[in-house]
UniProtKB/Swiss-Prot annotation:
Cellular location(s): Cytoplasm
Species: Vibrio vulnificus (strain YJ016)
Name assigned to this protein: Exodeoxyribonuclease 7 large subunit
Subunit annotation: Heterooligomer composed of large and small subunits.
NCBIfam families, per database record: xseA
Designated gene of the protein: xseA
InterPro entries in the record: Exonuc_VII_L, Exonuc_VII_lsu_C, OB-fold_nuc-bd_dom
GO MF term list: exodeoxyribonuclease VII activity; nucleic acid binding
Gene Ontology CC: cytoplasm; exodeoxyribonuclease VII complex
Region forming the signal peptide: none
One GO BP annotation of this record: DNA catabolic process
């Protein structure tokens, strides 16, 4: 049965496509903490790397449009927090993450906790404008919940003294930083509600890092603020600092000094109602913008999943992979060629005429030396043989006989006289001795 006519039989490409859509549509956005390894940044500007922990790892891709927003350059070994979409790289069937944002793990964990608590409390309606209490237009007594030694307290008191010196103030001192701060802040709010001596509370502190302000992002503090029967103005840090307490409070002031202005009548008779309404309008507008932004983000994610850019991204990733494979292949090819050239050079050195001539000269020198040694040995043997022969000849030589006292008589012509019949009267004879000769005449 053909796979083209039976819908229950998948091709590999169709299976990978279905799995990719399933991952992207069902799981959506995930937050992930891990260590970067195998980091690569090709000329395309995209980033490819692996996120791992002690037990597992997953491949990741972060495209140029997103990674240019990262405030640091990742390196192998970095611990990071990433926001990602699950996907599948269809050509290889590799499950991977498409990274949308990245930050160092320390700040990232706090931000992740912040976002999670914000979403949780928002879903319960703690941020809803309908649940917020109105700030009294002309408070009769103001409660301040902050550190008794912090600059925020003195800023608030200075503003109140300048604007409305007759306004009564009750200070509820508490820690505003550290592990015990959240409990103490919640207890101070509860104490102010129990005593019920103020008709508005300012809860806050001066500026600081995310860690310094973290007690105002605590769920206990948030729920205590929401449960307060006395209206609360949050005044945490500077205008750019935003905490969970700001969302839960009945009104948010950008600074402690601004909070003091909101609860005091200006000597120049500023319209406090207008300021309060402006603050409420700002809060409502921020809430509206937050909701609209969440809707836009959701719609953009849905739109992006159908956008041709994703196809282009996948093709770009495939092109980057091919580029990396080509580069590795070229490096391997060049290494093999270098090895081959090295072997050929070695062979050429072995076949070099200069080398051969040198070896032949050395061989001839060895042969010449062997011949000289052989000739010397031959001459030595011949001399020895001649000496032996000379000794033998010497033993039978007439001269040796003469040395023993004998003599040889010859005629004048050199004929040896061995018989008397060989001579006659008047012949001249020569007698040879060992040391000379004697001439005589026969009578």
């Amino acid at each position: 049965m053909s796979s083209l006519t039976n819908p229950n039989i998948f091709t590999v490409s169709r299976l990978n496509s279905e799995v990719r859509l399933l991952l992207e549509n069902q799981l959506g956005i995930v937050w992930l903490v891990g260590e970067i390894s195998n980091f690569s940044a090709p000329v395309s500007g995209h980033w490819y790397f692996t996120l791992k922990d002690s037990m597992a790892q997953v491949k990741c891709a972060m495209f140029r449009g997103n990674n240019r927003l990262v405030s640091f350059k990742p390196t192998n070994g970095n611990q990071v927090l990433v926001k990602a979409r699950l996907s599948l790289y269809e050509p290889r069937g590799d499950y991977q993450l498409i990274i949308e944002s990245m930050q160092p793990e320390g700040d990232g964990r706090l931000q992740q906790q912040f976002d999670a608590l914000k979403m949780k409390l928002a879903s319960e309606g703690l941020f809803a404008q309908s649940s917020k209490q109105a700030i009294p237009e002309h408070p009769k007594c103001v409660g301040i919940i902050t550190s008794k030694t912090g600059a925020a307290l003195y800023d608030i008191l200075d503003v109140l003294k300048r604007r409305d010196p007759s306004l009564p103030v009750v200070i509820y001192p508490t820690l505003v930083q550290g592990e015990e701060a959240a409990i103490q802040i919640a207890q101070a709010i509860g104490r102010a509600n129990s005593r019920n001596e103020c008709d508005v509370l300012i809860v806050g502190r001066g500026g600081g890092s995310l860690e310094d302000l973290w007690c105002f992002n605590n769920e206990i503090v948030a729920r205590t603020i929401a449960a307060s029967q006395i209206p609360i103005i949050s005044a945490v840090g500077h205008e750019i600092d935003v905490t969970i307490a700001d969302f839960v409070a009945d009104l948010r002031a950008p600074t402690p000094s601004a909070a003091a202005e909101l609860v005091s009548r200006d000597n120049s008779h500023k319209d406090q109602a207008l300021i309060s309404r402006e603050q409420k309008l700002r809060a409502a507008w921020r809430h509206y913008l937050t909701e609209q932004n969440r809707t836009i983000v959701s719609l953009s994610h849905r739109l992006e999943k159908q956008h041709p850019r994703y196809r282009l991204m996948r093709q770009t990733q495939q092109a980057d992979e091919l580029q990396i494979r080509l580069q590795r292949a070229m490096e391997k090819y060049l290494a093999q060629r270098e090895q081959k050239v090295s072997r050929v050079q070695h062979k050429l050195q072995l076949l070099s005429p200069v080398r051969q001539i040198s070896e032949q000269k050395n061989a001839l020198a060895r042969v010449e030396q062997k011949m000289m040694d052989a000739m010397d040995r031959k001459l030595l043997r011949l001399r020895h043989q001649i000496a032996i022969a000379a000794e033998k000849l010497d033993t039978v030589s007439p001269l040796a006989t003469l040395k023993r006292g004998y003599s040889i008589t010859q005629s004048e012509s050199g004929e040896v006289i061995t018989r008397q019949s060989q001579i006659k009267t008047g012949d001249t004879l020569v007698t040879r001795l060992s040391d000379g000769e004697i001439r005589s005449t026969v009578n």
